[in-house]
Amino acid sequence: MKKTTQLKQMILSTQLEFLMEAHSGMSAKIVEEAGFKGIWGSGLSISGSLGVRDNNEASWTQILDVLEFMSDATTVPILMDGDTGFGNFNNMRRLVKKLEQIDIAGVCIEDKIFPKTNSFLRDGAQPLADIKEFCGKIKAGKDIQKDDDFVIVARVEAFIAGWGLKEALKRAEAYRQAGADAILMHSKLSNACEIFDFMNEWGNRAPIAIVPTKYYTTPTEEFRKHNISLAIWANHIFRGSIQKMQEIAQQ
């Protein structure tokens, strides 16, 4: 089965599915061998492994070089963390074209301004993109893709920016209508109340993905109860590897 089809089926599944982060060919292979059905190509982790910050200091072509090694090393699908799409709608078109060439199954883009700001920076400004402009990126990506199963996930940062539930729903619906295959709803609270409030209003309009980095103590059964489709463990492999390298080096 094609990697794109595998990812599409995961997103459309009635069961909660999981992606684990990887940032190199080796880490991607480890994730697959651990039994994960898909991989999150984390922008933070890839940037960190290259020794740069998570704000587009690494170029998109440098990120794609790493993703190609990851794709070649594995048989499971990879969803790329595409930040803001690395520019405007033209950049998005070229990004999708290149991702398909290296057998990446999908891309997630967030509704922020390029260059992106990490969502968890303390007291950091979180300017959001214009809704119409971001919808244009989604449409551009869907128009250029050749594989019908290639997935575009729209990441909503309204909660991160402090704009509330109403804005989150407004943006998610606009992105769904623009053609997004799924919505990633992000939150920086230490509990999942914003996510669950959103799900109660959203219903089943489109599949929802989450990144429970901050609310990691929430039982996964609660995600199932709220009909969440995909949970992404976004940087666990990278953080764990840093700790082990530090321990070995200090010995």
What are these regions (language model features)?
Residues 2-229, 233, 240-246:
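Alpha/beta enzyme core
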Residues 249-251:
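Short, intrinsically disordered, charge-balanced linker/junction segments flanking boundaries
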